[in-house]
């Protein structure tokens, strides 16, 4: 079964947030004091999240990414992931994490059926990492990556949000990681999650990122897979790994968008930058799975052709990336 939106795009990818809480305070994601924590009763139970995931797979979703906040801070996450991994028809279960809890949890996550990890890492320099995350320790993340490798995970995808004057001087350092390691590094254009002034000054366009790398290395394009995300992928000639750029600001990828999102409060969103949301809670009050499936079809049916953000403007309401799931 295929899930097709009104613009002919095949939707096969669900980003499912399990919590708004995080053990970091990254500057591009939330204010220094953090975000107001949602009440326990506002967060969907694991049972309801499982029902949403199962309904999504039933109508054509093949890949589920578990996000937060930081998903690993929610108690009971490992048994929940094992249930998701066992859903018949699901091809990929992946998880995005900041890596801080991987030293203790990587082996259990692998045993639960998580197939791959995306790790948010914005600097390889301890002082810069602390400045961006405000409270994070770089070595913990590096230890987490090592623990994931020891647990048998494939090489991770490392996500770097590039910010001019903050960490853009490390683009070449991150690119070099892929030469000897079969990992993937994705450079993400800085995107405004709030109505901040002069955010454009922080954005390094994807073209500039690639030009910086190309100044030292020859890049070859890499073909994308069926459930791939929005990055344009390349390989340094002869390298073991790959790199990519995600250009939400300078060159939207809406024509190839294959995803929907569900927040930890049960709001379904067909676009990260859309102000529209669809509350799934009323459809969780019945035990009839068809009703929930039709609700998910409805949000796909109103998926916009493209978002309203560009390098000149950001036509969306302020939001917390931690609450919406990225």
From Swiss-Prot:
Binding, [4Fe-4S] cluster 2: 254, 257, 271
Residues binding GTP: 15, 65, 96, 157, 259-261
Superkingdom: Bacteria
Keyword entries, A-Z: 4Fe-4S, GTP-binding, Iron, Iron-sulfur, Lyase, Metal-binding, Molybdenum cofactor biosynthesis, Nucleotide-binding, S-adenosyl-L-methionine
Residues the record lists as binding S-adenosyl-L-methionine: 28, 69, 120, 191
A family per Pfam: Radical_SAM
GO biological process terms, semicolon-separated: Mo-molybdopterin cofactor biosynthetic process
Known catalytic reactions: GTP + AH2 + S-adenosyl-L-methionine = (8S)-3',8-cyclo-7,8-dihydroguanosine 5'-triphosphate + 5'-deoxyadenosine + L-methionine + A + H(+)
Pathway(s) it belongs to: Cofactor biosynthesis; molybdopterin biosynthesis
Cofactor: [4Fe-4S] cluster
Keyword Iron-sulfur: yes
Enzyme Commission number, as recorded: 4.1.99.22
Residue positions binding [4Fe-4S] cluster 1: 22, 26, 29
Domain Radical SAM core: 6-220
Cofactor mode of binding and number, as noted: Binds 2 [4Fe-4S] clusters. Binds 1 [4Fe-4S] cluster coordinated with 3 cysteines and an exchangeable S-adenosyl-L-methionine and 1 [4Fe-4S] cluster coordinated with 3 cysteines and the GTP-derived substrate.
Example of a GO MF term: 4 iron, 4 sulfur cluster binding
InterPro entries (UniProt xref): Aldolase_TIM, Elp3/MiaA/NifB-like_rSAM, MoaA, MoaA_NifB_PqqE_Fe-S-bd_CS, MoaA_twitch, MoCo_biosynth_MoaA/MoaC, rSAM
Coiled coil spans: none
Family per similarity comment: Belongs to the radical SAM superfamily. MoaA family.
Its biological purpose: Catalyzes the cyclization of GTP to (8S)-3',8-cyclo-7,8-dihydroguanosine 5'-triphosphate.
Quaternary organization: Monomer and homodimer.
Protein name: GTP 3',8-cyclase
């Amino acid at each position: 079964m295929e899930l097709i939106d009104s613009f002919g795009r095949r939707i096969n990818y669900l980003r499912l947030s399990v919590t708004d809480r995080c053990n970091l305070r990254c500057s591009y994601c939330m204010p220094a004091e953090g975000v107001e924590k949602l009440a326990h009763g506002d967060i969907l139970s694991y049972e309801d999240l499982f029902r949403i995931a199962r309904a999504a797979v039933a109508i054509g979703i093949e890949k589920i990414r578990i996000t937060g906040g930081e998903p690993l801070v929610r108690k009971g996450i490992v048994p929940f992931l094992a249930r998701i991994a066992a859903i018949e028809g699901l091809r990929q279960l992946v998880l995005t994490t900041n890596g801080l809890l991987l030293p203790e949890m990587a082996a259990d996550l692998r045993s639960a059926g998580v197939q791959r990890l995306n790790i948010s890492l914005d600097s390889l320099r301890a002082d810069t990492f602390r400045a961006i995350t405000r409270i994070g320790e770089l070595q913990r993340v590096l230890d987490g990556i090592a623990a994931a490798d020891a647990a048998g995970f494939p090489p991770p995808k490392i996500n770097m949000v590039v910010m001019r004057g903050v960490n853009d001087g490390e683009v070449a350092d991150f690119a070099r990681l892929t030469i000897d390691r079969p990992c993937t590094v994705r450079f993400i254009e800085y995107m405004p999650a709030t109505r901040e002034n002069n955010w454009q000054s922080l954005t390094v366009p994807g073209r500039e990122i690639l030009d910086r790398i190309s100044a030292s290395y020859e890049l070859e394009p890499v073909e994308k897979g069926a459930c791939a995300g929005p990055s344009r992928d390349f390989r340094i000639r002869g390298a073991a790994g790959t790199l990519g750029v995600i250009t939400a600001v300078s060159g939207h990828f809406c024509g190839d968008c294959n995803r929907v999102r569900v927040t930890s409060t049960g709001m379904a969103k067909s676009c990260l930058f859309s102000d529209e949301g669809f509350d799934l809670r009323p459809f969780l009050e019945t035990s009839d799975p068809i009703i929930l499936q039709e609700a998910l079809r409805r949000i796909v049916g109103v998926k916009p052709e493209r978002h309203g953000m560009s390098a000149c403007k950001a036509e969306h309401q302020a939001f917390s990336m931690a609450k919406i799931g990225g």
